[in-house]
Amino acid sequence: FKWIGRLNQAILGWKIRKAIGELNYEKPIIWTFLHQTAKVIDAINHSASIYHCVDDWPELLPMAKMGNPEQIKHDEWALIIRVGTIFTVSDKLLSHYQLPVGKVHFIPNGVDTTLFNPDDLPGTVLTEMSNLPRPIIGFSGSLGRWIDIDLIIQTARSFPAASVVIIGLNEKNPETQKLAGEKNIHFLGMKSRSEVPNYIREFDVCLMPFARTSVGQGLLPLKLFEYLSMGKPIIATNSGSLEIFRDVLYLADDSSMFIQQVKLAISEVDASLVRKRREKAHEYSWPARIQAYDSAISQSIDSKKIN
């Protein structure tokens, strides 16, 4: 359905041009998170153009039956060669392309360290969790196909006296049906963003059990920085993207090691590790991210003026 994509881009370009006229903007900065917007870039007179890549679309969208991987790559490459600047939230994203030198900036996700601040949270009693046995092994986020459901189940079975609590969206992953058979797994569903810190506060340790797929291996998710900002011990399946955070994570190379790392994290007593994680999160606060974006965009605009 290539014509649908072209039609969508034409409509989007027209709407943006209309808004630019109504707002009396001249040569705005075009900042897109959508891989299928090359024609939109062509249609708008701009001072700078940015593609902000937050996911491996050629792998992720076909999982949800939302496109052909080759067509997605074609559309994404058409965008890549048009924009002046590319931001990626993981150094593994876009690795299947031969990217233009100097155009790509690896800038991980930012975190709201004010919202995810355990010192400033209200004393809200979460009735869903108040009577659950401790320790609480928590997961916050989408249960997509990039999550290793079997590893969550293995964790629950390895710690039968603990409670495994999951908050977030079920991304129609058929594997999640297996969770219902585990007595100590509690799926609490979606929570508003303002509520999430209260739930993470109740977690004794936090999980990032990514599947051994190209999507899972390329993830550097927002939940990492939210967990860090709350100072929580984090157990994660190892990937190249997470190596730079090894000093603040319990990384595991396989399922057996993952369970051992959960055990170590649960028994953690060193308060300095909490401080270390929170300090790391502040390196990725939104003010720090905005400074990085601003620097890269300014370089792009200056380069365009010179050329």
Roles of regions detected by a PLM:
Residues 14-21, 67-86:
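Membrane-proximal helix-turn-helix segments that form the acceptor-binding/catalytic region
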Residues 62-65, 111-128, 177:
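Acidic anion/phosphate-binding donor-loop and adjacent secondary structure
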Residues 89-92, 107-110, 119, 203:
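Carbohydrate-associated surface elements
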Residues 129-147, 152-156, 167:
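Conserved donor-binding/catalytic core segment of Leloir-type glycosyltransferases
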Residues 168, 174-200:
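Nucleotide-activated donor-binding/catalytic signature segment of Leloir-type glycosyltransferases, i.e.
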Residues 194-199, 206-228, 235-247:
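Nucleotide-sugar-dependent
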Residues 248-257, 263-270:
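Conserved acidic donor-binding segment of nucleotide-sugar-dependent glycosyltransferases
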Residues 270-300:
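A charged, aromatic-enriched C-terminal amphipathic alpha-helix characteristic of glycosyltransferases
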